[in-house]
């Protein structure tokens, strides 16, 4: 007779604890596992409109045929069950130029069913002990087969949860088969996974099939995905992204259907029709159209990628809504990123990861270009050279000196007399002396140019200030996953490289990210900075305490950053003492709201405080949430226990993982 468990399991049932413990005590072999995986995706464009053109990776499906096929043969290298690399070796298909459409579908074929999150930090697994409180379970035992079927569903509907069932080996708790129904990044899916009984692979799937549907602004695309693991054909590591149906025919572990063969047969990329002479003139307009839409158009809305055995290059799309940022104090900005890596050997490679963008509030172009040579990855040894034009910096002393000489009646409001553009060069080396200690040393050069040159000349003030300084930094990580302590010293000297500023600065900082079961995260940060020597009150420029005019997203700088504090406040203080804390968790308060709560993926609470020379104490309280579309946060600031103002910040999250 079937037995049931709702919400909390009965004391006489051990099936759920066996599942929780199975992956812990049955890890794969310690040696690196290598698997060959065949993947087949079939797309059916049911409805589409012009908005499909601007969705990353969907450009190739925005026109032409409505059914497409894509096949890949891949090598997966598992370092452990949580960490693996997918290396594409052969690809074929009917999508133009063999483009990869909807890359987020790749996450669906290898869910980490025993982890807290199934898909790289998203969707809470029902088979992890930390998430048990979020699901209801029903158990049905088949004594004859020695298996148990466990049906699960969420206690509260949310895109971070799913429903389905699993067939489990009753005696051991090993999952033999699972069916998952849910939503992930605007994709509704149903995935069926069959798990291997082969030694060393028993907690990994050997075959999976997924039916997925993408709906967005009237566009509807359905996809069927088949993945087959443990394929016998072995390819050399030197083969990466070879193209051709003929090659795929020799590797494919399952035959194509009649409909799939027909898709290949009518694809011009594989069976081009020779043009007749009389058609040549008539096709010229189509060639121009192809150049415009396929070359220029695709470059605008999709990332530009290039990859070889030694080099990798990626530029974010030129037209990308994800690049738009807004904060109440910094205004709107648009930001792009470039990633480049060149590998000389396994232990030596060069990276260039610049970002550049435009801040509309102050109408200025910004960039930061770090060029890094990694020469000893094992000891975190690298040399880095960074060019940038940074954020504008205030110099309140300039206005004070002018008023002292020419009279207090002068009004410099809205004249940007104290604003300077900041260009810089940093050159330094980092090395891990011990497993818990890093030391970096180098040189820093700043050139600060007045924004209002005319007014500076009128009052006989310098237009350009330069500084040259050696620096030393120490990073201490006492234990793995513990707090990171840093101390930096920087000393500016006059007369070197036209430097006209002398100073000495010390800063200490401590940061700790404490991960709590259930995808919860507690961020703690504290820091102190001061100038031990300074001839004039020029350019208070702390490394760990400054505003940025090109802010990044939810996962980058929303924690540990002051959102409403005016830059002029900390640009005229000789010291700062700061403390920041934030708590992040899925399924807190907003999840319970009707209609919209099911789309809230994570929530975050902020508390920021700082003591400054002329502004103490200063507090910020904040609340934010993120989902598949957008991240939003609201902040309230208080100065000397008096309310100041409220501000907001948002980023687009839509298609961030595409």
List where the protein language model places each region.
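Structured extracytoplasmic
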Residues: 2-147, 155, 159-161, 217, ...
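Residues that define the transmembrane beta-barrel architecture of outer-membrane proteins
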Residues: 187, 330-334, 363-367, 421-425, ...
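Transmembrane beta-strand segments that form the barrel wall of outer-membrane beta-barrel proteins
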Residues: 152, 175-182, 210, 313-326, ...
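Repeated loop/turn-to-beta-strand initiation elements of outer-membrane beta-barrel proteins
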Residues: 344-351, 378-383, 435-441, 448-451, ...
